[in-house]
Curated annotation (Swiss-Prot):
Signal peptide: none annotated. GO terms for cellular component: cytoplasm. Belongs to the elongation factor P family. The keyword Protein biosynthesis applies. The gene is efp. Pathway: Protein biosynthesis; polypeptide chain elongation. GO terms for biological process: peptide biosynthetic process. Involved in peptide bond synthesis. Stimulates efficient translation and peptide-bond synthesis on native or reconstituted 70S ribosomes in vitro. Probably functions indirectly by altering the affinity of the ribosome for aminoacyl-tRNA, thus increasing their reactivity as acceptors for peptidyl transferase. This is Elongation factor P. It comes from Bdellovibrio bacteriovorus (strain ATCC 15356 / DSM 50701 / NCIMB 9529 / HD100). Coiled coil: none annotated. GO terms for molecular function: translation elongation factor activity. It is found in: Cytoplasm. InterPro entries: Elong-fact-P_C (IPR015365), NA-bd_OB-fold (IPR012340), Rib_uL2_dom2 (IPR014722), Transl_elong_fac_P/YeiP (IPR020599), Transl_elong_KOW-like (IPR013185), Transl_elong_P/YeiP_cen (IPR001059), Transl_elong_P/YeiP_CS (IPR013852), Transl_elongation_fac_P (IPR011768).
Amino acid sequence: MYETSDFRKGLKIMLEGKPYVIVDFQHVKPGKGNQFTRTKLRNMLTGQNLESTFKSGEKFEVPNVENKEMSFLYKDDTGYNFMSQETFEQIAMSEEDLGEAKYYLTENLKVVILFYNEKAVACDVPKAVNLTVAQTDPGIKGDRVTGATKPATMETGLTVGVPLHINEGDVLRIDTSTGEYVERVSQK
């Protein structure tokens, strides 16, 4: 059983008999009255988003989900294709099922696929991934204002704010929980 104090991004809970994943949450302690938790949830079966508020201390069941480690293979018209390293079984997932995880998938990336009632419903990516910059404006020599950033589009389509010295072809480490630039791994 989980309580509202256990909430974190990515936590899976049962609500009204359906499995949900917590997309975002905020613990609120008003000056007057009891504290509560405001959440944004995504239904793991339908992909629908739900905003809900829970009283402090409310309890939730843990959904019966099975985790399988798989590798991302490729994307085609059937969806995003993954393969189990143990059984070599292949599955395809839609963009809706993947949600934000689709922006972090690169060939052969090891991920954890969540199954609920034998259906792939979600994909957990590593905490940080390395992505190549596909497009960004060139950095101008001498243009080094402290903390300044520019937009960069990664190989997967993700747009990230990066420091001015980053160029196309650079490999960057991206935090998958926030979608933000962490560091440059290698230069072109």
